[in-house]
């Protein structure tokens, strides 16, 4: 606690805001708090607060999820008690837990505690990305297959954010973009990137595929492009897109492209991915051992 308070004296850090005249501070305590439980409470507070409309910025860089500890089984009850106490202080800043969990930002947040399957997939993606960037490879494709409800969106946002956290910790420049061809989802991702300070530090890191293709060249590829809902990518010219295959054009402009794909969604969209084109990309990923399948249903 002393270490955190001392950080307030450093003007470059967010803790310095605690010394401003209009700063407010909530101090939370519980007789069963230990380090692991306190960290999990902090993680969930960050996760919840990021989903609140009135919160503009979550300053802590990353979460620190804990595994098994005593009294882990009390986490939900203790957290709910804390949240109810905070709601008594300010109902606008601390909405009901059900309202938080219903919000689109909460559902897509990179601060979710990952399942073992998601964690394994995230570690593998980061490992493959690091190797590709180290070897200056281009047009690398990582293909994630998963039906609706298997946690592709959370895996996508979590891996995207983790790569930025690691780059910041290691003082590395990183050009990493998150693409989705869906108006509502792009708004959600933009709000997440803004609240986590990514847009302020790195510029517009979230965009539609066509915007990304038009703004980047094959000669200067970005490091990584994450594509959510890849079934929405176009395979023909439409509106402002003049090309023939958006996935191919994205791969031309990124050293590594990570796509989240649900083949079952193809039947319900205007875009129709020819089976042989889809299989060609999946096979490319399989040959390079870059194919991951999410099976565990989370809904």
Residue ranges and their predicted role:
Residues 14-17, 213-214, 247:
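Catalytic micro-motifs at enzyme active sites that drive phosphoryl/nucleotidyl and oxygen chemistry
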Residues 190-216:
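Short glycine-rich substrate-engagement loop in P-loop NTPases that contacts/grips substrate
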């Amino acid at each position: 606690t002393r270490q955190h308070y001392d950080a307030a004296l450093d003007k470059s850090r967010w803790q310095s805001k605690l010394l401003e005249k209009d700063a407010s501070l909530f101090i939370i305590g519980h007789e069963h708090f230990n380090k692991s439980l306190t960290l999990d409470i902090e993680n969930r507070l960050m996760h919840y607060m990021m989903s609140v409309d009135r919160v503009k910025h979550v300053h802590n860089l990353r979460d620190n999820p804990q595994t098994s500890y005593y009294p882990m089984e009390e986490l939900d009850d203790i957290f709910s008690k804390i949240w109810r106490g905070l709601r008594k202080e300010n109902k606008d800043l601390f909405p009901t837990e059900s309202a938080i969990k219903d919000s689109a930002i909460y559902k897509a947040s990179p601060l979710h505690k990952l399942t073992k399957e998601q964690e394994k997939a995230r570690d593998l993606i980061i490992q493959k990305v690091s190797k590709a960037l180290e070897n200056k490879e281009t047009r690398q494709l990582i293909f994630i297959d998963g039906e609706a409800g298997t946690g592709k969106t959370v895996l996508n946002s979590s891996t995207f954010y983790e790569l930025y956290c690691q780059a910041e910790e290691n003082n590395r420049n990183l050009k990493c973009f998150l693409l989705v061809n869906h108006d509502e989802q792009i708004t959600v991702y933009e709000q997440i990137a803004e609240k986590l300070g990514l847009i302020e530090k790195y510029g517009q890191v979230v965009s539609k595929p066509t915007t990304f293709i038009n703004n980047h060249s094959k000669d200067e590829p970005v490091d990584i492009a994450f594509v959510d809902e890849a079934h929405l990518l176009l395979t023909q010219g439409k509106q402002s897109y003049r090309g023939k295959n958006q996935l191919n054009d994205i791969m031309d402009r990124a050293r590594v492209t990570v796509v989240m794909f649900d083949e079952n969604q193809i039947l319900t969209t205007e875009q129709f991915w020819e089976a042989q084109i889809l299989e060609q990309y999946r096979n490319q990923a399989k040959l390079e051992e870059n194919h991951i399948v999410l099976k565990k249903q989370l809904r």
